[in-house]
C-alpha cells in the first residue's frame, strides 16, 4: 500500500536524524500521530533536526510519539518469548501487560467464538478525520471509566510501565520512564529502550484511530473517542519501525510479523471492536478467524 511505503520511508528518515543528530543534554519530544511538539535545550542544530523529524512522520496513522519509546532491538536481538505478557482472553480490560501467544486448541476455540461476535460493514470515508478529534495525544484526562485515566501520569507512560521491565524513572518522578526492557510482541524480540532514542518504541493503537473513524467513530461523542484513544485495551508498546508499517490497516492488510502472536492480536482487535460496538470489514473478520484456526 502507498501509505505504508511512505510511512516506512519517513520513519527511516526520522530514525537517521535521531541517530546522527548532534548530542544534547536534555530534550522532551512528543509526536502526536502526525504532529510534533518539541521542547529543546542544547543548540539550534538539534532543533532543526527535530523539525525535520516531525515533517518526516507527519501523516503516518498509528505512529506513537517518540517520547514513548526508544532503543529498538538491533538485528539479531534475542528472542523475547512472552515475558510477563498475559493471554488476551484472560485480560479483557487490557490492564495486564502485553500479548501472550494463544496456542492451545481450547483457547483457539474460545478466540474464534469471540471473533464470531464481531459485526461487519464496509469501510467508510476518511473525510474529516484528525487525531485531535480523539483528544490530544496521551491525555491523562480521559473519561474516568478508562483504566489508568486521571492517575497523575499520561497514557503513554502508563503503558510503558504496564509492559516494561527493569524500569527506570526520571529523578523525582514515579511516572516518566527513562529506560526499560520490552518483550515486543510484534517482532518477538527483546528491546532495551532508553528515552534518548525514544522513537524506536511506539504505542500502537491496535484498532487504529483512523480505522475507528471510518467504521463509525466519526459519529461518536468526544468522550467516547477519547476513551478508545486512551484505553489500555487498545494500546500496546511495540517496535517503532514495525508499527510504522501498519498505518491505519486492518488485519486483512497488516498483521504482526511475529506469526505466533497473530491469534492474540486478532483477539485483541475483536475485544476492542466489541467493547466499543465498532464493526470491522468482512475481509478483516475473515483474516482474524483464520489466525485462530487449527
Located regions from the model:
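N-terminal module-boundary/linker segments of secreted carbohydrate-active enzymes
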Residues: 71, 76-147
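Secreted/periplasmic proteins that engage bacterial cell-wall peptidoglycan
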Residues: 120-202, 206-207
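Bacterial N-terminal signal peptides that target proteins for export
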Residues: 35-47
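Domain-level detector of nuclease and nuclease-like folds
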Residues: 177, 185-294
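Bacterial signal peptide processing site
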Residues: 61-64
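C-terminal motif of bacterial Sec signal peptides marking the signal peptidase cleavage site
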Residues: 57-59
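Short, Lys/Arg-enriched N-terminal segments with co-localized hydrophobic residues
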Residues: 12-36
Amino acid at each position: 500500500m502507498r501509505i505504508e511505503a511512505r510511512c516506512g520511508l519517513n520513519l527511516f528518515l526520522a530514525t537517521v536524524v535521531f541517530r546522527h543528530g548532534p548530542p544534547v543534554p536534555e530534550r522532551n519530544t512528543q509526536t502526536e500521530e502526525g504532529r510534533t511538539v518539541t521542547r529543546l535545550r542544547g543548540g539550534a542544530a538539534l532543533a532543526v533536526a527535530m523539525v525535520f523529524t516531525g515533517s518526516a512522520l507527519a501523516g503516518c496513522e498509528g505512529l506513537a510519539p517518540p517520547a514513548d519509546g526508544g532503543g529498538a532491538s538491533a538485528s539479531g536481538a534475542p528472542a523475547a518469548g512472552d515475558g510477563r505478557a498475559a493471554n488476551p482472553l484472560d485480560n479483557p480490560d487490557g490492564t495486564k501487560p502485553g500479548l501472550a501467544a494463544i496456542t492451545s486448541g481450547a483457547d483457539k476455540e474460545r478466540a474464534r467464538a469471540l471473533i464470531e461476535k464481531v459485526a461487519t460493514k464496509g469501510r467508510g470515508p476518511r473525510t474529516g478525520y484528525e487525531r485531535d478529534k480523539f483528544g490530544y495525544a496521551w491525555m491523562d484526562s480521559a473519561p474516568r471509566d478508562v483504566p489508568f485515566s486521571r492517575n497523575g501520569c499520561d497514557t503513554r507512560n502508563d503503558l510503558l510501565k504496564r509492559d516494561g521491565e527493569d524500569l527506570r524513572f526520571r529523578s523525582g518522578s514515579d511516572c516518566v520512564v527513562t529506560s526499560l526492557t520490552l518483550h515486543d510482541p510484534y517482532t518477538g524480540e527483546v528491546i532495551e529502550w532508553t528515552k534518548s532514542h525514544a522513537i524506536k518504541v511506539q504505542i500502537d493503537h491496535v484498532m487504529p484511530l483512523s480505522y475507528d473513524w471510518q467504521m463509525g467513530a466519526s459519529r461518536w461523542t468526544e468522550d467516547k473517542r477519547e476513551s478508545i484513544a486512551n484505553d489500555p485495551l487498545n494500546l500496546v508498546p511495540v517496535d517503532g519501525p514495525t508499527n510504522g508499517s501498519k498505518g491505519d490497516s486492518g488485519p486483512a492488510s497488516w498483521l504482526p510479523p511475529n506469526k505466533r502472536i497473530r491469534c492474540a492480536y486478532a483477539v485483541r482487535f475483536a475485544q476492542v471492536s466489541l467493547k466499543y460496538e465498532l464493526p470491522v470489514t468482512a475481509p478483516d473478520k475473515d483474516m482474524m478467524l483464520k489466525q485462530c484456526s487449527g
